[in-house]
């Protein structure tokens, strides 16, 4: 059927369209120069209007677009409209049946996902959301019309409501699921560890997100959560033992985790590995070779000897090298360098050896060619860094030569090789669940290894337990942003906070928490204590009072109670400890650097060396251009890592902490602690 404008109507209307033709499932409007096809699946409404003389048809399309036909005889316009409308409505009724079926399928999908007795992940809800939106975009009717049809209206509204409140629906489902699991598995959560898990620990264990960061403050029971998580996966049948990968950062920590797993879960089929042991396993399986880790990796003296020998050789044989090294050590490091053959000076050799060791290690950790290292350095230091790299290149070459002679690899090389094998698909990961301890210590290289494992199976979950307040190993490559920006680096997921510490009292917690959270770059989290502490639980004391303090402790400390003396550097070990065995024979006293004390605890902690200066705490920034270019960027907040080191020291104690300071040259931390209402005692 066709409708045309009258001759006069056409002339007066001056409109691009003057006729319309009804098609099988649409309408075509056209004029002398223009033609427009309107499929019914884009048509929202048809309006028939009468002007002063002629009729007018109006076709409403999406995005507020309207197509009009003017100048038609009114009677013919009415007849055409009624015929077109009946045809369109008939077509719409048929299409509504199809749309209704599609909508019901979407409701079934929602019901299936939300009805499952399992955690609903963000990834799953995003997938459902995407699937529903794709289904809506493929409907034969415009979604704006679905409210018109009785068979579509309710289903459409339910789909829209779910899409609108998708996050609250997910949270509601997971809350109900968690409560059900905590009730159903109450015995498991009571018995899986030596003490029952608290609600925050149990909720972290139950959380089924693909990428989960568990922030575990000092003494909050992170190991219990890792063990319980492994046990939970087994109890729920979500994984077999060989599908669970448990990672620790040191061999001792891995061995302790193994023992805990055997003791609590009664299985030897789950083995905790270090990242290096994992890399070794991947290389063995993926290349059928058994790489040998160089003896040099565990022999500091031999490494130092190797680097100093090569350094002396370069300086003695090449004037340019000698000149470059003299300039580096005097201008940048501000060291006193002897005249003449400075490379033969034994004191300088001893001082430089550990630096050369660290710098070669950083270059190996980077793993790229010299040009890549230089290109990745900040622009403002790139030229100078390029000169330093050229001076270091022979030492790196000597290191590689030593490895080749030994037919061995180093730790950095292990991880690089493992990543290459994974990326080439020569090793297929069997692990569905990766659990990582001390996640805050992760470096970009180790993060790349995790990413390569998860890339092979997008459903592999990452359960990362750590504490950004205790990131103290930047010199080993630890990058705090991998924890603080966890989901940007490891995909969308969740965060759980373990909110109770079983170690220290409320006063130690209050001081330590306020001290660390003055840095806005640290994640905010609660950490509550089970015991109260008085004002003196943290006390500032003059360093001259150490003997008097130990005298006093000898009067009331029980034989089984441990006293831990902590310092920023090993050479700050107090001379008083030389006589400890005879003067305080009943006291159980240990000395450690704060770095070494990580993971330790004691009844009483004495922090020594709170002074300013070259051996001060906080330590003065003494990075060379090598660290600046090859390590993660230094944070903007002053003494950020040193502040975290102080937090670690404070939180080793159960009952009391004494911070001993130099009255003549006190550490800046002393004033900060005073401002946190920490009292200064004249005597213990």
Predicted regions and their residues:
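A basic/glycine-biased coupling hinge at the interface between accessory DNA-binding modules
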Residues: 143-170, 174-176, 182, 234-408
């Amino acid at each position: 059927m066709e409708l045309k404008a009258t001759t006069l109507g056409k002339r007066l209307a001056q409109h691009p369209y003057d006729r319309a033709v009804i098609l099988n499932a649409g309408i075509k409007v056209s004029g002398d120069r223009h033609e427009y096809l309107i499929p019914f699946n884009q048509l929202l409404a048809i309006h028939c209007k009468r002007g002063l003389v002629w009729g007018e048809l109006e076709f409403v399309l999406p995005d507020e677009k309207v197509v009009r036909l003017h100048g038609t005889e009114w009677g013919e316009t009415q007849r055409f409209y009624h015929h077109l409308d009946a045809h369109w409505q008939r077509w719409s009724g048929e299409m509504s049946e199809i749309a209704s079926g599609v909508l019901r399928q979407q409701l079934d999908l929602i019901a299936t996902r939300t009805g499952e007795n399992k955690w609903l992940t963000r990834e799953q809800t995003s997938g459902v959301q995407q699937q529903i939106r794709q289904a809506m975009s493929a409907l034969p009717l415009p979604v704006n019309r679905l409210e018109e049809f009785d068979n579509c209206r309710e289903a459409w509204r339910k789909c829209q409501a779910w899409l609108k409140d998708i996050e609250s629906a997910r949270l509601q489902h997971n809350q109900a699921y968690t409560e059900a699991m905590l009730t159903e598995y109450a015995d498991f959560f009571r018995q899986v560890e030596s003490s029952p898990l608290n609600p925050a620990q149990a909720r972290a264990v139950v959380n089924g997100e693909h990428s989960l960061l568990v922030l575990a403050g000092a003494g909050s029971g992170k190991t219990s959560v890792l063990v319980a998580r492994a046990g939970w996966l087994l109890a729920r049948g979500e994984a077999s033992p060989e599908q669970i990968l448990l990672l620790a950062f040191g061999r001792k920590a891995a061995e302790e985790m193994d023992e805990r797993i055997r003791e609590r879960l009664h299985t030897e089929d789950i083995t905790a590995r270090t990242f290096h042991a994992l890399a070794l396993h991947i290389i063995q399986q993926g290349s059928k070779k058994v790489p040998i880790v160089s003896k040099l990796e565990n022999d500091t003296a031999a490494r130092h000897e190797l680097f100093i020998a090569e350094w002396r050789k370069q300086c003695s044989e090449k004037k340019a090298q000698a000149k470059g090294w003299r300039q580096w050590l005097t201008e940048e490091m501000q060291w006193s360098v002897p005249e003449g053959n400075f490379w033969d000076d034994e004191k300088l050799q001893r001082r430089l050896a550990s630096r050369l060791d660290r710098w070669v290690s950083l270059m190996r950790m980077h793993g790229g060619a010299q040009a890549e290292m230089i290109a990745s350095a900040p622009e403002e230091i790139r030229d100078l860094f390029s000169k330093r790299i050229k001076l270091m290149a022979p030492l790196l070459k000597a290191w590689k030569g030593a490895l080749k002679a030994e037919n061995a690899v180093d730790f950095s090389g292990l991880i690089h090789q493992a990543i290459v094998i994974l990326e080439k698909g020569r090793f297929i990961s069997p692990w569905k669940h990766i659990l990582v301890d001390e996640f805050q210590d992760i470096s970009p290289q180790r993060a790349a290894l995790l990413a390569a494992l998860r890339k092979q199976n997008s459903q592999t979950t990452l359960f990362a337990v750590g504490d950004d307040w205790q990131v103290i190993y930047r010199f080993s490559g630890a990058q705090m942003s991998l924890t603080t920006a966890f989901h940007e680096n490891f995909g969308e997921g969740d965060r759980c906070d373990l909110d109770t510490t079983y170690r220290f009292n409320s006063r130690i917690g209050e001081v330590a928490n306020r001290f660390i959270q003055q840095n806005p770059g640290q994640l905010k989290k609660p950490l509550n204590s089970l015991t109260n502490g008085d004002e003196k639980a943290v006390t500032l004391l003059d360093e001259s009072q150490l003997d008097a303090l130990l005298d006093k402790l000898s009067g009331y400390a029980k034989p089984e109670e441990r006293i831990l003396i902590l310092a920023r550097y090993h050479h700050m070990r107090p001379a008083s400890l030389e006589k400890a065995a005879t003067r305080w024979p009943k006291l159980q006293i240990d000395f450690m650097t704060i770095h070494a004390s990580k993971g330790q605890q004691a009844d009483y902690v004495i922090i020594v060396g709170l002074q300013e200066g070259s051996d001060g705490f906080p330590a003065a920034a003494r990075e060379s251009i090598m660290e600046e270019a090859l390590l993660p960027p230094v944070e903007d907040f002053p003494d950020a890592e040193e502040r975290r080191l102080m937090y670690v020291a404070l939180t080793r104690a159960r009952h009391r902490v004494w911070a001993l300071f130099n009255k003549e040259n006190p550490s800046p931390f002393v004033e900060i602690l005073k401002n946190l209402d920490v009292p200064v005692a004249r005597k213990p």
